[in-house]
A protein has these predicted regions:
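Short internal beta-strands
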Residues: 16-24, 47, 144, 210-217
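Hydrophobic or amphipathic alpha-helical targeting/insertion segments
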Residues: 13-35
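Active-site flanking residues adjacent to catalytic metal/cofactor-binding acidic residues
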Residues: 3, 20, 121, 145
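Single conserved hydrophobic/aromatic residue that forms the stacking wall/gate
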Residues: 1-8, 12
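Short, well-ordered beta-to-alpha junction loops that form the rim of enzyme active sites
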Residues: 2, 22, 184-187
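Core dinuclear metal-dependent hydrolase active-site scaffold
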Residues: 67-132
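Cap/insert and terminal regions of metallo-dependent hydrolase folds
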Residues: 103, 124-216
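Acidic/polar short surface loop at catalytic or gating sites that assists cofactor/ion binding
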Residues: 28-72
Length: 217
């Protein structure tokens, strides 16, 4: 991650940004929205800094930065081999983490020798309701692997068990006449929650759910 705004501007000034097609489309929505939040946060912090006599801060990136970067995006289909520059080729493979996520296979040719490097990115799980199962690139000379959880193991539970647990939470909340607040990532998790809520409504799994308004921020 580049933390200095000037460094980021230098990196993206004229360079193409290769991504999956879905990622490019999502960024058209998410980057301007995130930039607006960055500008608001900086404005709020600067009001406090002015009162305290502290230096002003700049937003991590602005709406103009976002607009400039979006012009550089090049959406690429999964499994298509593209040339990044002479001697460097790449391919995106669907890893089932969220819409547009990918592992990146990179082939680098130096002195007639081709080396294959695989960057895993965040890897999803099998049997997700709205995302394809992850695919595994075959073979690599070097593998750069995500390790979000280190050496910890996930608690093993089936999707059916998780769905029933979610349904039970909703049933309890409705029975108490209370509100249920669910923090969730805007991309991926929120859509999955909506999928399950729709299933509950169609199947009648959660009595009274049809009378409950659902709001998404």
């Amino acid at each position: 991650h580049l933390c200095d705004r000037r460094q980021r501007q230098m990196c993206i000034r004229d360079s193409p940004i290769f991504s999956t097609e879905a990622t490019a489309k999502l960024c058209g929505i998410m980057l301007p929205d995130s930039a607006h939040i960055q500008e608001q946060d900086a404005e709020y912090q600067n009001r406090k800094n002015e009162r305290a006599g502290k230096p002003l801060v700049e937003p991590l990136y602005t709406a103009q930065d976002a607009e400039n970067s979006l012009r550089l995006f090049k959406g690429v289909r999964y499994d298509s081999i593209i040339q990044i520059c002479p001697g460097v080729e790449a391919r995106f493979t669907d890893v089932g983490h969220l819409l547009g996520s990918a592992a990146i296979e990179v082939w680098v040719t130096v002195g007639g020798k081709k080396t294959r490097i695989v960057f895993s990115g965040d890897i999803g799980r099998d049997d997700r309701p709205i995302i394809k199962d992850p695919e595994s690139p075959e073979g690599a000379d070097y593998l750069v692997l995500e390790s979000t959880y280190g050496d910890r193991l996930h608690t093993v539970s089936t999707d059916d068990e998780k769905e029933q647990e979610f349904a039970e939470i909703l049933r309890e909340g409705i029975a108490r006449g209370g509100n249920i607040v669910i923090p969730a990532f805007a991309v991926g998790r929120t859509q999955e929650l909506l999928y399950y809520i729709k299933r509950f409504l169609v199947n009648g799994t959660v009595p009274g759910l049809e009378k409950v308004p659902v709001y998404i921020d």
